[in-house]
Swiss-Prot record:
This is Subtilisin amylosacchariticus. Belongs to the peptidase S8 family. The lineage of its organism: Bacteria, Bacillati, Bacillota, Bacilli, Bacillales. Residues 38-103 form the Inhibitor I9 domain. Subtilisin is an extracellular alkaline serine protease, it catalyzes the hydrolysis of proteins and peptide amides. It comes from Bacillus subtilis subsp. amylosacchariticus. Keywords: Calcium, Hydrolase, Metal-binding, Protease, Secreted, Serine protease, Signal, Sporulation, Zymogen.
Length: 381
């Protein structure tokens, strides 16, 4: 009898220990996952020769999980908990640890904007963007649209791997403003003969990690794009994002980015990133009367303006619709850059940018209007 009681007591004790251990493990796992976030870990330039395996080890040894190592940025995207972040910031090989922020699309029959920026003047001369490659870094492009010529692309959205499907419609709309075909249907783009490339970095909700955008820009560099359009942005800066944008520009690419839809806030800049970086052309929005759109972000970083109110363009499923936003203004600038390059293929990206800015039509205070409304006819002279 005593032996039976002893056995029951032992069994109960073992069960209790197992239950407590399991509960503790579960609590630890839950606690760890709840504090894990996405970060970008940058390594010091003196460590540029460090192997990919060694960089991965530095992060893994601190408990982090490497998601992606970049090609042109000496950094890696990783999932880290708070402890790993603190330890990595102390590591002598690490230059910075920054949150992998999320960017969003800036969204609100021949579109009036095409005439407003004087694109038809170049069309009549036979310049329509031929042999110019434009990367639309966005939510993808519906390549089945009969009014679009999509030549290639890639997706960096892990859950949406097809760059030719556009769940939010944003990228398809942007693409049409840049290069909708000169045919008997739909709308006309600024640069109808330009080659479009769908670089998907935003998901169907219109959001994307900065690391996805970095991957997209790296793809554009590696695939020798001439122009990058980024109708997206976020409120937070990023060393890694700035590095790759600067690399794109130093590689000869014209980079146009939406200034943002935050309106104005006194004397404070509301321009988002990456438009805020000096190497990009930051684009604000005006209406058909050249009045600044109330939603258009303002700041000293603003470079030029373009039409961005009630812009008619392509939508998925072979349809069309009108959107508002600096997202809609930016492709007018990207398309204009493609037009200029089709007329002057030997011009550098710096020359293209200088011409777009120096020939822009003055509209008012540069804090709100930058250099003014682009005039591609004058810019291409």
């Amino acid at each position: 009898m005593r032996s039976k009681k002893l056995w029951i007591s032992l069994l109960f004790a073992l069960t209790l220990i197992f239950t407590m251990a399991f509960s503790n493990m579960s609590a630890q796992a839950a606690g760890k996952s709840s504090t894990e976030k996405k970060y970008i870990v940058g390594f010091k330039q003196t460590m540029s020769a460090m192997s990919s395996a060694k960089k991965k080890d530095v992060i893994s040894e601190k408990g982090g999980k490497v998601q992606k190592q970049f090609k042109y940025v000496n950094a890696a995207a990783a999932t880290l908990d708070e402890k790993a972040v603190k330890e990595l910031k102390k590591d002598p090989s690490v230059a910075y640890v920054e949150e992998d922020h999320i960017a969003h699309e800036y969204a609100q029959s021949v579109p009036y904007g095409i005439s407003q920026i004087k694109a038809p003047a170049l069309h009549s001369q036979g310049y329509t963007g031929s042999n110019v490659k434009v990367a639309v870094i966005d939510s993808g492009i519906d390549s089945s649209h009969p009014d679009l010529n999509v030549r290639g692309g890639a997706s960096f959205v892990p859950s949406e791997t097809n760059p030719y499907q556009d769940g939010s419609s944003h990228g398809t709309h942007v693409a049409g403003t840049i290069a909708a075909l000169n045919n008997s249907i739909g709308v006309l783009g600024v640069s109808p003969s330009a080659s479009l490339y769908a670089v998907k970095v935003l998901d169907s909700t219109g959001s994307g990690q900065y690391s996805w955008i970095i991957n997209g820009i790296e793809w554009a560099i590696s695939n020798n794009m001439d122009v990058i359009n980024m109708s997206l942005g976020g409120p937070s800066g990023s060393t890694a994002l700035k590095t790759v944008v600067d690399k794109a520009v130093s590689s000869g690419i014209v980079v146009a980015a939406a200034a943002g839809n935050e309106g104005s806030s006194g004397s404070s800049s509301t321009v988002g990133y990456p438009a805020k970086y000096p190497s990009t052309i930051a684009v604000g929005a005006v209406n058909s009367s050249n009045q600044r759109a109330s939603f258009s972000s303002a700041g000293s970083e603003l470079d030029v303006m373009a039409p961005g109110v009630s812009i008619q363009s392509t939508l998925p499923g072979g349809t069309y619709g009108a959107y508002n936003g600096t997202s809609m203004a930016t492709p007018h600038v990207a398309g204009a850059a493609a037009l200029i390059l089709s007329k002057h293929p030997t011009w550098t990206n710096a020359q293209v940018r200088d011409r777009l800015e120096s020939t822009a039509t003055y509209l008012g205070n540069s804090f709100y209007y930058g250099k003014g409304l682009i005039n591609v006819q004058a810019a291409a002279q």
